[in-house]
Regions:
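Phosphate- and divalent-cation-binding pockets in alpha/beta enzyme and binding domains
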Residues: 55-58, 144, 178, 187
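Short beta-strand-to-turn element immediately C-terminal to the catalytic PLP-Schiff-base lysine
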Residues: 23-24, 136-137, 178-180
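Activation segment
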Residues: 15, 105, 145-146, 189
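A residue-level structural signature of the nucleotidyltransferase/glycosyltransferase Rossmann-like core
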Residues: 101, 133-134, 146, 167, ...
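Nucleotide and nucleotide-moiety/phosphate-recognizing core
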Residues: 1-131, 139, 163-170
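Short, glycine-/small-residue-rich phosphate/pyrophosphate-handling segment
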Residues: 130-131, 135-161
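Conserved alpha/beta core of the MobA/IspD/sugar-nucleotide pyrophosphorylase nucleotidyltransferase superfamily
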Residues: 149-191
Length: 191
């Protein structure tokens, strides 16, 4: 079973307030929209949140999004990803999405998931030559994912296993559009 991981444990330092709570589509918060898009394709998803964000945790749970609280989220994206992966050891693959990227099309998520039949597969979407999210990892990478740390997520795995990375060209600008500042939010097509 493919496991969706929604990384929602950041601290929104560049935004100035909790960007993941900002309303976008029909008033739904950014993180909820991103989670819904992931869930549209993957029945099993898990959102990882930081221990200081009870409001986001509650909001996700109210929208039937399972959460896990990463006690050391301040160590960075890698630590949060490792925490979530270690909580889902039964998965056959992990599709890792970012909660500040609500524009990814479900068809792109499905394509990434479909490329992970081989346990050694790694899949990344590419739009106009730019690699984006979500990123998918087959079962063979469980140990490496579960030991990540720092603020660069799974970048080291993508470099170390470059020969295994499938670059899936897609017509989805959402894979490279994240919301880091209020200006990014204002220019989001969903607003």
């Amino acid at each position: 079973m493919n496991q969706g991981i929604l990384l929602a444990a950041g601290f929104s330092r560049r935004f100035g307030s909790n960007k993941l709570l900002q309303p976008i589509t029909d008033g739904a918060p950014l993180a909820v929209v991103a989670a819904r898009r992931l869930r549209a394709v993957l029945p099993e998803i898990l959102a990882v949140v930081n221990p200081h964000d009870a409001v986001l945790a509650r909001l996700l749970e109210q929208n039937d999004i399972p959460i896990t609280v990463c006690p050391h989220a301040q160590k960075g994206m890698g630590a949060s990803l490792a925490w979530a992966v270690s909580r889902t050891p039964q998965a056959s693959a992990w599709i890792i999405a970012l909660a500040d990227m609500p524009l990814i099309q479900p068809a792109t998520i499905a394509r990434i998931a479909g490329a992970l039949c081989d346990p050694t597969a790694i899949a990344v979407p590419v739009f106009q030559g730019r690699r984006g999210h979500p990123v998918g990892f087959g079962r063979a990478y469980f140990e490496e994912l579960a030991q990540l740390n720092g603020d660069h997520g799974a970048q080291s795995l993508l470099r170390h296993h470059a020969e295994r990375v499938q670059r899936l060209v897609c017509n989805d600008p959402g894979i490279v559009m994240d919301i880091d500042t209020p200006a990014d939010l204002d220019s989001t097509p969903l607003n």
